[in-house]
């Protein structure tokens, strides 16, 4: 015979189950954070300080093997760099570990690029160049032309510093192509400066005149 106490007991069991499910769900990256990540990424290039503010408000506490957490770590690395905030490699290592195992060329390229940036800042030039070159390969699979400009510029500058002028010019031309496709006027201007530096180092001064002509 079903009594009122049986209903109460069943209700208690259901409440406990729902509570456990809710707790388990909260340990995963909340889906509510996804729009915030998208918003931060959308304003990263023009308003990196605003992007950083959004990302700082998320503060996830979840396993690193989670796409949204890895995305947060990657974007936080990017935002801190753009805001000239000193950082360790702990966040980029999370992003790198995740995205190098998954089929997302843009995210992989971005993670490789910032691995290179942080290795370069810690005076490990060979490691940095290796990451940049791998990033340059990945970015060709995407239409993220702003990132393409940044990656190819870094490779070109490293080759220019080593006086490997032909290699530098190859990557500066790729950077210029990406800058034009991105329609970012600042990047276009810098791409001409980089090409001019390569021509100057090669002592091809007539070529400098040609690129300065409208």
Feature locations, PLM:
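Bacterial N-terminal signal peptides
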Residues: 11-19
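Residue-level detector of conserved catalytic or cofactor/ligand-binding positions
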Residues: 207-214
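Amphipathic alpha-helical segments of tetratricopeptide repeats
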Residues: 56-61, 93-101, 133-143, 173-183, ...
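Bacterial N-terminal signal peptides that target proteins for export
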Residues: 2-11
């Amino acid at each position: 015979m079903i009594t009122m106490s049986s209903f109460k007991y069943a209700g208690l069991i259901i409440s406990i189950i729902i509570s456990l499910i809710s707790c388990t769900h909260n340990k995963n990256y909340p889906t509510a954070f996804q729009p915030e990540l998208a918003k931060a990424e959308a304003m990263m290039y023009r308003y990196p300080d605003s992007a950083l503010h959004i990302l700082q408000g998320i503060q996830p506490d979840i396993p690193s093997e989670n796409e949204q957490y890895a995305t947060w770590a990657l974007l936080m690395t990017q935002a801190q760099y753009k805001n000239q905030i000193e950082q360790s490699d702990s966040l980029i290592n999370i992003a790198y570990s995740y995205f190098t195992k998954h089929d997302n060329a843009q995210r992989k390229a971005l993670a490789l690029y910032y691995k290179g940036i942080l290795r370069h800042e810690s005076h490990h030039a060979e490691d940095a160049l290796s990451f940049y070159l791998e990033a340059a390969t990945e970015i060709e699979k995407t239409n993220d032309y702003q990132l393409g400009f940044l990656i190819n510029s870094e490779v070109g500058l490293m080759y220019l510093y080593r006086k490997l002028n032909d290699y530098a010019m190859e990557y500066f031309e790729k950077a210029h192509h990406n800058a034009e496709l991105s329609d970012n006027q600042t990047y276009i201007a810098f791409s001409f400066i980089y090409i001019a530096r390569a021509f100057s180092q090669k002592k091809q001064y007539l070529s400098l005149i040609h690129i300065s002509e409208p």
